[in-house]
């Protein structure tokens, strides 16, 4: 099916023809035949790299150019950024694109000027809770990775958000994009959608198992040269000899980094002079963005053509690795499975070194088939590779047979709603009532009838859980009941708008009411004791130190559980460890020191700080509404967590472009406020932070004079404190 034959405006047809896309892939053509461009709901359950995004673009462009508005929902911020960059190409068609992924208590009415809005499912839910007006103008909703409804973490939010959008805009087109799942027909029926189900791929995918020097596929075998003792490295080298690149999936961050390091000597020998020059530039950028030991290891790997990729890295480092790989200079990325979750980063060969993953409940367990299919689907770059290969590793012939049966010849599992627990449902019951989607228990059950859970299990299974949620919300003062009417209180409405678990809000309110003296530690631990906080993992070497700290600071905790209650006490110690990380962060400890002390990654520090800042913001707002102590202290800590600095630097940090390191330099040199800077000589400030930053500072505080360039040697003479920039500077 040719692009020129589609029912689309001429400028859209020209856009794609000029982009080198003259015709559709077979699954795309099937989607058009089933009503994609006629506003019909559609579920496309097709493999990775088979053109799902183009389906979304065609539906959105058809609707937007007819005066509509499109919402593109993604599961991850990184994926939102990737799609946003892609959709900005539509500016030549006069289309405006916006993105929104954070600040859960904002309406973001300004986003409404855009024609296409990219948002995470959580942000979409928060926009609905805050009654953002432009949400009612949405004419097409694209849900990327809709199979994540099966996720216990993100699934319930996505499911309820879809139900709300469909109730608010009953004539809105829903386009759901999914990996191939076992019960795609059931998911399509729930969405009242036509189903496009296909295994077609633009490049052939050869799935197989490597054993005893041979790559076994269904219908052929390939002998692999063995220049090293590591089978996976030999597979990588085999791919590089043929001009391809490799993704290697590992089960843990430690293994991920270890393999990238191990492969450096072998991969480096394959690099051209141009490769080495470009890789050196990427490595230098990595070191400019971070001073941690992990960044140093990553830069060393990148110089040799390898890299690792996991959530412990900051976003700038991950993006540098991804860009280097897309441009063909990084030959190998060793990654945790997070890379398989949506990011467009295909490779000639995908190697899955371990198909087992540790579970705290049941030890090492085989990964689901769906997860294997997601990783395998990254093999084969459309229009670049003649084929793709997905390789599992076996240590015995019996394991080879097991892997063929378990993964290669198996279909993906069915997906199941995870909405039917009190923890999952509590926040959505409150928001549904607060937003007026339901005003009685009967209306609430009618609304929940539209969820995937009710479609799979019937509403009967939800009734008992809903009663438990309603009882909790009434007891905590978030709901009132007048006869049959369910009414959200001011407390309940605020909790819903702030996008916090009602249990977290109840714990914060209780903690502020009952606390004696409110110290930094008291408030940080209160935040870390909520279910919305992501806690640090306890290592064996942590127990003694943190237990000693608890004993020395017991009066600063609202409650210390008995050490004889092993599960509760260990959970408490994790809360304390997370609090101590945040304590080091706001006291300006170097990020590398924090990483080493807590056994974490730089990216984890920023993620933990982001979540803590949000929950501390909630604490501030709740304290003000309920007239509880701690509002002022929480507001100050919220700002300090944002910047990772002491209270004396807050005035300086309000100037854009000054991070905590530069602010501390200025403060140490006697510039303790914007007023001090207003009276400073440009040369003195430039000696501390550089001429470009100095000029930006003076522009913001109302001074326009130019700052002269000074040499590196002069700057070193004028400021012995000057050091290499880190991500915190920015």
Swiss-Prot record:
A motif (DEAH box) lies at residues 144-147. Residues 232-433 form the Helicase C-terminal domain. InterPro entries: DEAD/DEAH_box_helicase_dom, Hel308-like_dom4, Hel308_SKI2-like, Helicase_ATP-bd, Helicase_C-like, Helicase_Hel308, HTH_61, P-loop_NTPase. CDD domains: DEXHc_archSki2, SF2_C_Ski2. It comes from the Archaea. GO terms for molecular function: 3'-5' DNA helicase activity; ATP binding; ATP hydrolysis activity; DNA binding. Residues 33-199 form the Helicase ATP-binding domain. Residues 707-720 have a biased composition (Basic and acidic residues). Residues 707-730 are annotated as: Disordered. The keyword DNA-binding applies. Residues 721-730 have a biased composition (Polar residues). The keyword Isomerase applies. ATP binds at residues 28, 46-53. PROSITE patterns: HELICASE_ATP_BIND_1 (PS51192), HELICASE_CTER (PS51194). GO terms for biological process: DNA repair. It catalyses: Couples ATP hydrolysis with the unwinding of duplex DNA by translocating in the 3'-5' direction; ATP + H2O = ADP + phosphate + H(+). Its EC number is 5.6.2.4. Keywords: ATP-binding, DNA damage, DNA repair, DNA-binding, Helicase, Hydrolase, Isomerase, Nucleotide-binding. Monomer. Belongs to the helicase family. Hel308 subfamily. DNA-dependent ATPase and 3'-5' DNA helicase that may be involved in repair of stalled replication forks. This is ATP-dependent DNA helicase Hel308. It comes from Methanosarcina acetivorans (strain ATCC 35395 / DSM 2834 / JCM 12185 / C2A). The lineage of its organism: Archaea, Methanobacteriati, Methanobacteriota, Stenosarchaea group, Methanomicrobia.
């Amino acid at each position: 099916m040719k692009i020129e034959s589609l029912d689309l405006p001429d400028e859209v047809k020209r856009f794609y023809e000029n982009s080198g896309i003259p015709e559709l892939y077979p699954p795309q053509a099937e989607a058009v035949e089933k009503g994609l461009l006629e506003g019909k709901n559609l579920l496309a359950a097709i493999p990775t790299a088979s053109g799902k995004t183009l389906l979304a673009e065609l539906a959105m462009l058809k609707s937007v150019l007819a005066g509509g508005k499109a919402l593109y929902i993604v599961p991850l911020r990184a994926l939102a950024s990737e799609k946003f960059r892609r959709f900005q190409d539509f500016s030549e068609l006069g289309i405006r694109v916006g993105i929104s992924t954070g600040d859960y208590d904002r309406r973001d009415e300004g986003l409404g000027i855009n024609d296409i809005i990219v948002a995470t499912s959580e942000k979409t839910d928060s926009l609905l809770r805050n009654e953002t007006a432009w949400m009612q103008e949405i004419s097409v909703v694209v849900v990327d990775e809709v199979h994540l409804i099966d996720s216990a973490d993100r699934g319930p939010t996505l499911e309820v958000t879809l139900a709300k959008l469909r109730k608010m805009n009953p004539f809105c087109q829903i386009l759901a994009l999914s990996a191939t799942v076992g019960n795609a027909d059931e998911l399509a029926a729930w969405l009242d959608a036509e189903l496009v189900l296909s295994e077609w791929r633009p490049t052939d995918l050869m799935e197989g198992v490597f054993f005893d020097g041979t790559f076994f596929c269904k219908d052929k075998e390939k002998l692999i040269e063995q220049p090293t003792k590591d089978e996976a490295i030999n597979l990588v080298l085999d791919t590089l000899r043929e001009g391809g690149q490799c993704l290697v999936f590992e089960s843990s961050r430690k293994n991920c980094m270890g393999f990238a390091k191990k492969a450096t000597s072998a991969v480096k020998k394959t690099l051209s002079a141009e490769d080495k020059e470009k890789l050196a530039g990427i490595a230098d950028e990595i070191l400019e963005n971070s001073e941690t030991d992990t960044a140093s290891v990553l830069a060393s790997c990148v110089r040799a053509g390898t890299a690792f990729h996991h959530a412990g890295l900051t976003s700038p480092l991950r993006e540098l690795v991804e860009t280097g790989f897309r441009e063909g200079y990084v030959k190998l990325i060793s990654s945790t499975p997070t890379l398989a979750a949506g990011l467009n980063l295909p490779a000639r060969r995908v190697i899955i070194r371990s198909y087992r993953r540790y579970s705290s409940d049941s030890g090492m367990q085989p990964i689901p088939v769906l997860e294997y299919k997601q990783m395998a689907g990254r093999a084969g770059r459309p229009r670049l590779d003649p084929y793709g290969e997905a390789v599992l590793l076996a240590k015995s012939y019996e394991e080879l047979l097991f892997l063929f049966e378990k993964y290669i010849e198996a279909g993906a599992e069915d997906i199941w709603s995870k909405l039917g627990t009190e923890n999952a449902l509590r926040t959505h019951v409150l928001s549904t009532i607060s937003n007026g989607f339901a005003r009685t228990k009967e209306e609430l059950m009618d609304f929940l009838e539209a969820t995937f859970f009710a479609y799979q299990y019937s509403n009967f299974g939800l009734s008992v859980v809903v009663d438990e949620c309603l009882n909790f919300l009434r007891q905590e003062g978030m709901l009132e009941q007048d006869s049959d009417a369910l009414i959200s209180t001011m407390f309940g409405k605020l909790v819903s708008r702030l996008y916090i678990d009602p249990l977290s809000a109840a714990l914060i309110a209780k903690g502020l009411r009952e606390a004696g003296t409110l110290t930094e530690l008291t408030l940080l631990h209160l935040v870390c004791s909520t279910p919305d906080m992501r806690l640090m993992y306890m290592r064996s070497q942590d127990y003694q130190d943190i237990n000693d700290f608890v004993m020395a600071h017991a009066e600063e905790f609202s409650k210390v559980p008995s050490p004889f209650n092993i599960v509760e006490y260990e959970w408490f110690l994790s809360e304390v460890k997370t609090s101590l990380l945040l304590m080091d962060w706001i006291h300006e400890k170097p990020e590398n020191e924090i990483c080493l002390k807590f056994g974490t990654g730089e990216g984890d520090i920023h993620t933990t700080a982001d979540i803590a800042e949000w929950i501390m913001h909630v604490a501030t707002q709740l304290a003000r509404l309920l007239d509880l102590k701690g509002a002022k202290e929480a507001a100050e800590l919220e700002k300090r967590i944002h910047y990772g600095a002491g209270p004396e630097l807050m005035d300086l940090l309000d100037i854009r472009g000054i991070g905590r390191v530069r602010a501390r330099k200025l403060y140490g040199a006697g510039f303790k406020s914007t007023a001090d800077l207003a009276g400073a000589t440009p040369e003195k400030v430039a000696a501390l932070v550089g001429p470009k930053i100095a000029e930006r500072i003076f522009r913001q505080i109302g001074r326009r004079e130019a700052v002269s360039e000074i040499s590196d040697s002069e700057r070193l003479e004028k400021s012995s404190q000057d050091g290499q920039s880190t991500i915190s500077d920015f």
